[in-house]
Amino acid sequence: MKILHIHPSMNGGGIESMICSLANEMSKTDDVSVCSIFAPTDEAVFWHKLSPSVKKFDLGKTAPGFSVKEIFKIYNFIRRGNFDVVHIHGFFYYYAFSVFLLHRRIRFVYTIHSDAVKESSGWDHKFLPIKIFAFRKAFIKPVTISKESKRSFTALYNIESTLIYNGIAPYERKATTDTIADYRITPQTKVFIHPGRISEAKNQVVLCKAFKAIIDAGKDVVLLIAGSRQDEVIWEKLQPYWSDRIIYLGERKDVRDMLHDADAFCLPSIWEGMPVTLLEAISVGCVPICSPVGGIPEVITNGVNGFLSTDSSAEAYAQTLTNYLNCENLEQVKANCEETFKEFQISKVALQYLSVYKEK
């Protein structure tokens, strides 16, 4: 089967990580290509992590923002590629023209990587009537990534979707030294890591407020934030929190090694789909401390394989951090994380997608 995964870029992020993992796994048995609409840069972390067996293409876009000419570039690339399946991961407006003209001879699959309403924002919201029509006429096969994502999709589009949880490959260490050691202020310091772009969804202002509260209460903790500066307004709000115990690292290429070396993983999001960073955390026994949104409660049971706050507020999250610090059976929680991960391995997920690709 000739398969194309296409996306605006392969920079750091959960969707890009998922595309990389799927493409690498599928390329073991099928002819797989990945196309980046933007020209790859050194920051395109997952472009450089694609297997040599994956064919890589880019459309050379460099200017920010949406341009109509990209629609025609994408159409011509897909039309000439003779693909059996084109797998889209959001940003429908880029692909609408291709879907309507090519759906009779190419199978289009669309993964909704978040809440269906949140996912259809910006330009996708302008295209929403066309998107609804394409889904309802079965021009595209929809896939959702959690029960909550599936529920939101059904509510918005009034049709069903196939549920396939995200997955990742087992951990293979790249670092040769402890990536966290330099951030421990004392031998007892607990180091927490939050990998995520600076954005409304990831709720970093609340995260920093919660950590400031427990630091002010005398807790020996350090928070590391690793991710791109997507929202400059939120970035400015974070400036007062930076200190020797709340540290912004920028984008990192070694997030999974850092998760392996850290004590806990933080994700106080306002909304989510099925966070790939959460799966990366449990795969290495990094205890997750999360808000109960999206597909997170479908992975984490509070006190068993992680900790869930009651909501996404600073007060609730600070209390959950305290619950983690007071936990007396963290080694068992870590072991439970790694056991949970067995259900989210990319080998299983890829087989489920390949089955969807073959559906009539």
Where do the PLM segments sit?
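Short hydrophobic beta-strand element within catalytic cores of glycosyltransferases
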Residues: 287-290
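N-terminal strand-loop element at the rim of the active site
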Residues: 5-66, 149-154, 163, 229-231
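Short His-centered aromatic/hydrophobic patch
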Residues: 88-95, 112
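Acidic anion/phosphate-binding donor-loop and adjacent secondary structure
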Residues: 63-65, 151-155, 165-183
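Aromatic "clamp/platform" in nucleotide-sugar-dependent glycosyltransferases that forms part
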Residues: 251, 270
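Conserved donor-binding/catalytic core segment of Leloir-type glycosyltransferases
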Residues: 4-6, 186-202, 208-211
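Short, structured helix-loop element that forms part of the nucleotide-activated donor/catalytic region
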Residues: 42-50, 222-245, 249
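Conserved acidic donor-binding segment of nucleotide-sugar-dependent glycosyltransferases
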Residues: 302-303, 307-314, 323-328
